[in-house]
UniProtKB/Swiss-Prot annotation:
This is GMP reductase. PANTHER family: GMP REDUCTASE. Belongs to the IMPDH/GMPR family. GuaC type 2 subfamily. The gene is guaC. One of its GO terms (biological process) is purine nucleotide metabolic process. Catalyzes the irreversible NADPH-dependent deamination of GMP to IMP. It functions in the conversion of nucleobase, nucleoside and nucleotide derivatives of G to A nucleotides, and in maintaining the intracellular balance of A and G nucleotides. It comes from Lactococcus lactis subsp. lactis (strain IL1403) (Streptococcus lactis). Keywords: NADP, Oxidoreductase.
Length: 329
């Protein structure tokens, strides 16, 4: 493991500006390549039931954004792949690691329903079960880009890459509705950005930073530390289009947002590592995506470059928990 004293998180880091070389931030290119595809932003909405559904997946794919469909309506996944392909769109799904999921992988392979992306999505991804699932997918569908996670250590990244994963997802419980750290004592909460840095250093393939993103500036910080893509939950929750239920409180509209390991998700109170919260209604998802793009373009201009690669080279300072100076976000 790296020097455990050098841990930091998003609010502890400030990036240092370089001389600007573009006339307008609109010249900055925020696109990113993942596998054989190029996407508009290095951002993917979390594959959670209160964040993404079929409609949002279609909208994102049509507009040139990356998406990962959640795995919580397992029986609809084959039809989802078919529907996306019929429209000439990429299919990007999630799977678990149990026997029924292996049967599903064999089934879509036999039916030639080959998704472009499969994300193996479990809470503790440094596991033999994940390695076996990677190997199964790669044996049956070698052309499919496999994302595996979630992990929090360089050792885990190396092992999953060696098993055949094309990218790893880094983050154990730093998310807003994840309580893994409280329930188990384990996780990357409080040092998620350092975990991204260490894991990216060990990686030879893309790393997706997953969890703990509270502001658009955190996306730039993730890229600085080596992430290719950033998975975002709470910032994408509670939009007009979001699947979460709308609730009215004191004349204000809110939407539900819950974790993938919450009892609301599982439908039972067993091994619960997530909770449910209400977030203020945020308007249109397209507006948020546009604002994210503009903020990232500004980040690139501050980095002194023309595209995302500029962010990987900037200097930064560690300002222990003080960038807010007591202000709320």
């Amino acid at each position: 493991m790296n020097n455990l004293n050098s841990v930091f998180d998003y609010e502890d880091i400030q990036l240092i500006p370089n001389k600007c070389v573009i006339n307008s931030r609109l010249e900055a290119d925020t696109s990113v390549k993942l596998g054989n595809f190029t996407f508009k932003l290095p951002v993917v909405p979390a594959n959670m039931q209160t964040i993404i559904d079929d409609k949002i997946a279609e909208m994102l794919a049509k507009e040139g954004y990356f998406y990962i469909m959640h795995r919580f309506e397992a029986e609809n996944r084959a039809a989802f792949i078919k529907k996306m392909h019929q429209q000439g769109l990429i299919a990007s799904i999630s799977v678990g690691v149990k026997a029924d999921e292996h049967a599903f992988i064999r089934e879509i392979s036999a039916d030639a329903l080959i998704p472009e992306f499969i994300t193996i999505d479990i809470a503790h991804g440094h596991a033999d079960s994940v390695i076996k699932t990677i190997q199964l997918i790669k044996r049956l569908m070698p052309q499919t880009f496999v994302i595996a996670g979630n992990v929090g250590t360089p050792e885990a990244v190396r092992e999953l890459e060696n098993a055949g994963a094309d990218a790893t997802k880094v983050g154990i419980g730093p998310g807003k509705v994840c309580i893994t750290k409280v329930k188990t004592g384990f996780g990357t909460g409080g040092w998620q950005l350092a975990a991204v840095k260490w894991c990216a250093k060990a990686a030879s393939k893309p790393v997706i930073a997953d969890g703990g993103i509270r502001t658009h500036g955190d996306i730039a910080k993730s890229i600085r530390m080596g992430a290719t893509m950033v998975m975002v939950g709470s910032l994408f929750a509670a939009h007009e289009e979001s699947p979460g239920q709308t609730v009215e409180r004191d004349g204000q509209l809110f939407k539900e947002y819950f974790g993938s390991a919450s009892e609301y998700q599982k439908g039972e109170h067993k091994n619960v590592e997530g909770k449910k919260i209400l977030l203020p209604h945020k308007g249109s998802l397209k507006d948020t995506l546009k604002e994210m793009e503009e903020d990232l373009q500004s980040s690139i201009s501050y980095a002194g470059g023309r595209d995302l690669s500029a962010l990987t080279k900037v200097d930064y300072v560690v300002v222990k928990n003080s960038i807010w100076n007591g202000d709320a976000i």
